[in-house]
Design a protein with these regions (language model features):
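DNA target-recognition domains and sequence-specific DNA-contacting regions of bacterial/archaeal
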Residues: 1-6, 55-206, 255-260
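Non-catalytic DNA-recognition/assembly elements of restriction-modification systems
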Residues: 4-46, 65-114, 210-254
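Alpha-helical scaffold segments that mediate packing/assembly in large oligomeric complexes
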Residues: 42, 46-62
Length: 260
């Protein structure tokens, strides 16, 4: 795109102020999301790694001498009423339809997720809700992404969808970080993850009470993160649309706004 540049130095400074305000807000939103992700990880670690989830009296379980028992499959002590399961028992795993790169365009509204996260945009989506998608081909095998609602997930990623939809999928996203995903990777030439190899991964299975309680606590963090990402997209689009209009003089800046 050819953009005609403003020659007036004061106008250039005003334009820079406006664009800088967009960049600052976008950076702030990304920082908020980083903090939200860190909080979600910390919560999982505290409850499901250190086992200091709230017991029946609201006290941290393990620190309050909650009974622990050895689990042979997980090779560790876990709370007495907890057990193990496999990824395939609690999740549906599948690879959706792949899109050709020629069909993607930055002008389309819906994000497309592949092996390396967002790979472009498309005019349709194949998943209504936010999903957990794992890269299953190439050097990025095992990398996890939370997709945005109304996104297209390609066959280069494995969708990992909890069968029990009363449980927030942040649980499985965090649990997979502690599973032996690397050991499930196969392929002598190009690394790959198959559904069969992933389905047998051992996962900790907390009590239903704790899973539901965890979901209630973590859901607002996930919702906030998704909303921040939507605002980042909106601000980025506005900035990119506004830039050429400002530079060629089609849009002018109110001097009161430029001084804010």
């Amino acid at each position: 795109m050819h953009v005609q540049f403003q020659e007036d130095i004061n106008e250039q400074k005003n334009i820079a102020k406006i664009l800088s305000a967009f960049d600052i807000k976008i950076a702030l939103n990304r920082q908020i999301n980083d903090n939200l992700e860190a909080m979600a990880k910390q919560l999982y670690d505290y409850w499901f790694v250190q086992f200091d989830f709230p017991d029946e009296n609201g006290k941290p379980y393990k620190s309050s001498s909650g009974k622990m028992v050895w689990n042979e499959k997980l090779k560790r002590n876990i709370p007495e009423l907890w057990t193990d399961t496999t990824l395939g028992c609690i999740c549906d795993l599948y690879q959706p339809q792949t899109l050709g790169l020629s069909l993607l365009s930055d002008d389309e509204p819906f994000k497309v997720y592949g092996a390396n996260g967002i790979v472009g945009h498309y005019n349709k989506y194949n998943h209504e809700q936010s999903e957990i998608a794992m890269a299953c081909r190439g050097n990025s095998c095992g990398v996890l992404n939370r997709t945005m609602p109304k996104s297209w997930i390609t066959g280069n990623a494995m969708v990992i969808h909890l069968k029990d939809e009363t449980i927030n999928n942040e649980f499985i996203k965090q649990a997979l970080k502690y599973a032996n995903v690397k050991g499930a990777i196969s392929g002598s030439g190009q690394p790959q993850l198959t559904r069969e190899n992933l389905e047998v991964l051992n996962i900790i299975k907390p009590s239903q009470r704790i899973l539901l309680l965890y979901s209630n606590v973590v859901a607002p963090l996930v919702e906030k993160e998704i909303n921040m990402e939507k605002e980042i997209d909106r601000l980025t689009k506005q900035r990119n649309t506004l830039l050429p209009l400002l530079m060629n003089g089609q849009v002018t800046i109110n001097y009161h706004l430029s001084d804010d």
